[in-house]
Every structure is written in structure tokens, then in C-alpha cells.
Curated annotation (Swiss-Prot):
Function summary: Reversibly catalyzes the transfer of the carbamoyl group from carbamoyl phosphate (CP) to the N(epsilon) atom of ornithine (ORN) to produce L-citrulline.
Subcellular location as annotated: Cytoplasm
Pfam families: OTCace, OTCace_N
Single GO term (MF): ornithine carbamoyltransferase activity
Organism annotation: Synechococcus elongatus (strain ATCC 33912 / PCC 7942 / FACHB-805) (Anacystis nidulans R2)
SUPFAM superfamilies, alphabetized: Aspartate/ornithine carbamoyltransferase (SSF53671)
GO biological process: arginine biosynthetic process via ornithine; citrulline biosynthetic process; L-arginine biosynthetic process
InterPro entries to which the protein is assigned, alphabetical: Asp/Orn_carbamoyltranf_P-bd, Asp/Orn_carbamoylTrfase, Asp/Orn_carbamoylTrfase_sf, Asp_carbamoyltransf_Asp/Orn-bd, Orn/put_carbamltrans, OTCase_ArgI
Binding site for L-ornithine: 159, 222, 226-227
Catalytic function, reaction form: carbamoyl phosphate + L-ornithine = L-citrulline + phosphate + H(+)
Keyword annotations from UniProtKB, A to Z: Amino-acid biosynthesis, Arginine biosynthesis, Cytoplasm, Transferase
Pathway terms, separated by semicolons: Amino-acid biosynthesis; L-arginine biosynthesis; L-arginine from L-ornithine and carbamoyl phosphate: step 1/3
Protein name (Swiss-Prot/TrEMBL): Ornithine carbamoyltransferase
Binding site for carbamoyl phosphate: 50-53, 77, 101, 128-131, 262-263, 290
């Protein structure tokens, strides 16, 4: 079964071979070895603020000869309570694909259930699959492989952590989540990652950031308070301060380690400016790769290649 016409709601929806197919295409699109003509219309429904995801999806479809419609919920009937089922069925008659950024994974899944076009997860509270595809592309660019590497994620066991668990497992890369005990990833997602990884990679949940960073090839962090968690910010700062990605922690990693952050970054909170702007940071390449990875996703789901 190919990817054309499929949804991308979580990386667990894909086989390892399909993840590799997306990443291979993303690399050839970036290098210019492959060009894709995809004169399709992509709709964006974003209930949360966005810079990289909104712009990279828009640029991706337009650079392939398509067009984008920004369907802000506040200026559509969705914002006035029209059922998702009705909206999804109607938009399927006008558009070729939907990229949706919303809070509840359940809402995204409802869109996918009723839509007759591909629905892409542009971030929910549970998952951020397109971000992790760009992350994996960045890692491969730097190391030429994923096997025998270890990625350590420092911070909240959130949507990014969940998708890193699944994505690393899909490509056979060891993954460690270093987090306070009260902020662990969901057990069902950890179990799914372990199932996918099998004996190809190790999936670990640790609470000691120093031990977790020891010998790692990739150190990765994210903001401590995500959108909608602002009231918890003070408690989160207290809990996550030991997990700050700073030079001392970076020195525990492999000498050739790279630093990733999905952005936006709060300097001197989850990451120091020294590390973010340092020679081992690949954050800006990582952000660029959102464009190439999402071009690959769109091209494959829309049957353009």
C-alpha cells in the first residue's frame, strides 16, 4: 500500500519503510536531484500560533506549483461551532489536502475520519510528526546514518518527545527521554516505540540529565511550557532547570554531538545562548528541513511522485 491518499496523523501510522521513503525524497528534493510538480490546493486549519509549520507548509506547496488557503478557525464556521464532521466533508470537495494544528488529537482524527482527502498533523497536544521528519533528515545529513546513534531529549515528555520516540524507533536510532518523574511521556506511546524498535534500538526514559547525555550523538530540547500551559510556567521552570541544555551538559555528550531545538527557543531557560548559537548547533538547518520534509510528505500523500 503506497502513501498516496493516506493521512499522516502520527508516525506510528507509517511503516519504517515509509518513513525512509519520505526521508529519502526529502533529501533529494533539498539537493535538487528531484523536482516535483504538484498543482494541488492545501488548506491550513491552525487553532494554535505557528511560524515554522505554517510558513514551511505554505512555501512547500507553492514551490511545487500548488496553492494554499489559510482557513483560520476564527473566520470560518468552525469557530462558531460547526461540527468537524460537516466541515471535513465540505472541505474535501474544495481542497486536495488539509494540514491541521489543533489541541486535541481526537479532533484531528475526527477530521481524518470524515474527510476524503489526506489530513496531515501539523501539531497536536500528543504528536508533532512533521517536526520529527525534519529532525531525522538533519541527523542523517550530519552523520550519514541513524543506526548506532543515540538521541537524548531533555525536558517535558510532550508531543515532540512522543514523536521523537516513534521516529527514532522507526529508523533504528537509540532514544533517551530525560525528564522529571512528573513529566514523563505517556506510557502507551513509550510501549509503542519499544514495539517498533524491537531489537534494533533502545528506548529509555531517564531522570538524570547527566547520565542521559553521556555519549549521546544528538542533544535535543524544547520549551518548558507549551502553548496553553502558561499558568504552569513557574512550576515548570523549577522542575526543568536541572535539564537545561548548557555547555556543561553538552560536554558529557559525544565530541561530535549536534544540538537540536524545534523552536521557538527561550534562551537561558531550556537552552543557553552559548549552546544555541555554538558550533555544534544545527538548529537553523533543522528549521530549514521542515520545508523539504513537508514537500516530501505532500508529494507522496498527493500522489505527485
Amino acid at each position: 500500500m503506497g502513501l498516496a491518499g493516506r493521512d499522516l496523523l502520527t508516525l506510528a501510522d507509517l511503516s519504517s519503510a515509509e518513513v525512509l521513503e519520505i526521508l529519502e525524497l526529502a533529501a533529494t528534493l533539498k539537493s535538487g536531484q528531484t523536482t516535483v510538480h504538484c498543482p494541488k490546493t492545501l488548506g491550513l486549519i491552525f487553532s494554535k500560533s505557528s511560524t515554522r509549520t505554517r510558513v514551511s507548509f505554505s512555501a512547500a506547496i507553492m514551490q511545487m506549483g500548488g496553492q494554499v488557503l489559510d482557513l483560520n478557525p476564527n473566520v470560518t464556521q468552525v469557530g462558531r461551532g460547526e461540527p468537524i464532521a460537516d466541515t471535513a466533508r465540505v472541505l474535501s470537495r474544495y481542497l486536495d489536502a488539509l494540514a491541521i494544528r489543533t489541541f486535541a488529537q481526537q479532533d484531528l482524527e475526527e477530521y481524518a475520519h470524515y474527510a476524503d482527502i489526506p489530513v496531515i498533523n501539523a501539531l497536536t497536544d500528543d504528536y508533532h510528526p512533521c517536526q520529527i521528519l525534519a529532525d531525522l533528515q538533519t541527523i542523517q545529513e550530519n552523520f550519514g546514518q541513524w543506526q548506532d546513534l543515540t538521541l537524548t531529549y531533555l525536558g517535558d515528555g510532550n508531543n515532540v518527545a512522543h514523536s521523537l520516540l516513534l521516529g527514532c524507533a522507526q529508523v533504528g536510532m537509540n532514544v533517551r527521554i530525560a525528564c522529571p518523574p512528573d513529566y514523563q511521556p505517556q506510557e502507551r506511546i513509550v510501549a509503542k516505540a519499544q514495539q517498533i524498535a524491537g531489537d534494533r534500538a533502545k528506548v529509555e526514559i531517564l531522570h538524570d540529565p547527566i547520565a542521559a547525555s553521556q555519549g549521546a550523538h544528538v542533544l535535543y530540547t524544547d520549551v518548558w511550557a507549551s502553548m496553553g500551559q502558561e499558568e504552569e510556567a513557574q512550576a515548570r521552570v523549577k522542575a526543568f532547570t536541572p535539564y537545561q541544555l548548557n555547555q556543561a551538559l553538552l560536554e558529557k555528550a559525544d565530541p561530535a554531538a549536534i544540538v537540536l531545538h524545534c523552536l521557538p527557543a527561550h534562551r537561558e531557560e531550556e537552552i543557553t545562548a552559548e549552546v544555541l548559537e555554538g558550533s555544534q548547533s544545527r538548529v537553523w538547518d533543522q528549521a530549514e528541513n521542515r520545508l523539504h520534509a513537508q514537500k516530501a510528505v505532500l508529494a507522496l500523500l498527493l500522489g505527485a511522485i
